[in-house]
Amino acid sequence: MRYTIITLGIIVIGIGIVLSKQWITVFYGIPVWKNSSVQAFCMTPTTSLWATTNCIPDDHDYTEVPLNITEPFEAWGDRNPLIAQAASNIHLLFEQTMKPCVKLSPLCIKMNCVELNSTRERATTPTTTPKSTGLPCVGPTSGENLQSCNASIIEREMEDEPASNCTFAMAGYVRDQKKNYYSVVWNDAEIYCKNKTNSTSKECYMIHCNDSVIKEACDKTYWDQLRLRYCAPAGYALLKCNDEDYNGYKQNCSNVSVVHCTGLMNTTVTTGLLLNGSYHENRTQIWQKHRVNNNTVLILFNKHYNLSVTCRRPGNKTVLPVTIMAGLVFHSQKYNMKLRQAWCHFEGNWRGAWREVKQKIVELPKDRYKGTNNTEHIYLQRQWGDPEASNLWFNCQGEFFYCKMDWFLNYLNNKTWDAYHNFCSSKKKGHAPGPCVQRTYVAYHIRSVINDSYTLSKKTYAPPREGHLQCRSTVTGMTVELNYNSKNRTNVTLSPQIESIWAAELGRYKLVEITPIGFAPTEVRRYTGGHERQKRVPFVLGFLGFLGAAGTAMGAAASSLTVQSRHLLAGILQQQKNLLAAVEAQQQMLKLTIWGVKNLNARVTALEKYLEDQARLNSWGCAWKQVCHTTVEWPWTNRTPDWQNMTWLEWERQIADLESNITGQLVKAREQEEKNLDAYQKLTSWSDFWSWFDFSKWLNILKMGFLVIVGIIGLRLLYTVYGCIVRVRQGYVPLSPQIHIHQVGKGRPDNADEPGEGGDNSRIKLESWXKDSKSRCMQLTAWLTRLNTWLYNSCLTLLIQLRKAFQYLQYGLAELKTGAQEILQTLAGVAQNACHQIWLACRSAYRNIVNSPRRVRQGLEEILN
């Protein structure tokens, strides 16, 4: 009995040791991701030529799948690659649409210019009756509607632009003929002059002549109405933060959803104000870069105030083509003191919006704002520097507008001062009012030479187009800097940082890469289950449904890996079809543009990612498996997942530092498994078994044996010859201790009685050599006998020990069998007794039920009798 208990204990301990071990298991289809900077592609509902050749058609799918997770978000390009992509891509759009194509280098010559007088071309715009004789625009809020403005009064208040009529000479069509003289009208801001000959004539050059390459746009093109969406390639996704208190930076956004594409975003490039953007909330928001940076601040207006700006160019401008030489035509314009001037009117409750902005600024936390808390000491001012920075700059119908914002800023601040914040009287500058006035409209200037801040270069475009120009834009925000050198005053300075536009549009999104391969320890060493039939699940949410389980526990998510992996593959295939259709359309029109190449790159990236995942699974022996058990032991006992409460995302972040080690062990285990499988197949191969009956194989074996025997004999002969040579050279053989030595008399030489020979030494040497060889053979025979005896005893002892072990094992199995039989007998007895008791109880209940009428009858009879 004691041995039985010991045996059972050993077996239980062994089973416990085996079950306590955990093995690495590979899961495919888990909802896990990591931040990515892969190139996104675009969708657009616009049907223009540029849109159809650069973006795929919009599918109008705005499905959002909520995730029960927390995720960090950042709205600026240095930490959000999607914002950096937008800045680069919109610049490419800008370059492609407004691409200069005619070199202006022939005009980098000396020109004789004469300043034009102040005779002004009258505007042809019909006038309206002003509602007030004091201001051009009147209304409840000093001109909230453009219809309340007198266009004639506004145009008369516009300052004259100094211009010059310049003449220059060139060879013309035939180079050996006399030079032709041409006359061109230039704005004084686009030329620089020297060596004035008199008060009116001067020598001038174009302002861009110091630059290396300057080109002029052939055609006027623009994209005022173009809106697009950024979409993640297959195998990637976009996460969106929906928290109401999101301000461009949040470490733990709790209301997170996954989307395939962003919302429609605006592509209007501006400085200072955000035009035609998207409204997020019905309230004013202040976003600061990295939460505490006051040099990059984004203010999003409340849509309740209905802010907008309407720009128009008065008059009918005529562009004159000047043929310089064959194949080179330059565009000039008529003499006019308002060559490039326009005006814009700001509509809506701007003062109410500005009051709410100031209130939001003083409500900022102390770690984000340390300026004054008095809203009366917060002022809005413009920037200094390049024209694009000091003015409100944007593109309207292909023309570049530069707005001097002093009048409008005075209106918002309700102050009367100049650009240097010096109080002054509203004196007129000629027919135009001075800088110290309050207006809801400002003067715009159209420029042809602009500064490209993205490439740090200059670009020259054609003069303004003919006809009437007008465009209306909604104002959704502004980019500013918060400057407070003292606590008595805070300056809100308009900023030319274009990147903030895309931060406002895409700041709630982040691009992530789906990593569907995960590792976790399980008690199963290898996959032993049979084939299970799996239900086909319809793709209700497609690719987004794959990430819907991101917030669920690991155990629940692992149970639906098959469906999730199908969602992943279905989303990849659908996106590939859409991208391929767009690329084919671009190929047919021979317009594979820069963005078309990006779309093609997104398609290739998705295929590469999917093939890379499958290649990794195949290298571990887990190809096309959702759950793959391996033979690699999990060595990190202090890291185990909580299958009921932990998500896959949390678990993968815990073991991120172990991934390279895990993958290396899986690859080594797979290689060893393949080697073992190859060796096993060779052992179990029937071709190898029947090869033993091949006569040629036996001949080879005999040949090898014969060669071995010949080699041994040859070595023995060489050894014998070598020994003989050594003995001959020595001249004697040492006497063996076994040879008897005859005793001779003292002083008597050997064989002294026999005359003649000098003794019998040769015969004695030969006999001793033969006896020595015989003794060596006897020693070898004795050694072999002892070796044989030792081998026999060892084998006998081993067999005895094995027999004893087998007897112990047989005895233990017999005891286990006896114990199992006793347990079964006991269980059978208990079951029999239980069944018998149940039978008795049922029979008693049945009898009681059956006998109830009889007993009732008997009771009634007794009562009645």
From Swiss-Prot:
Residues 403-444 are annotated as: V4. Residues 744-763 are annotated as: Disordered. GO terms for biological process: membrane fusion involved in viral entry into host cell; symbiont entry into host cell; virion attachment to host cell. Residues 166-209 are annotated as: V2. Residues 600-616 are annotated as: Immunosuppression. Pfam families: GP120 (PF00516), GP41 (PF00517). Residues 727-865 are cytoplasmic. This is Envelope glycoprotein gp160. It comes from Simian immunodeficiency virus agm.vervet (isolate AGM TYO-1) (SIV-agm.ver). The gene is env.
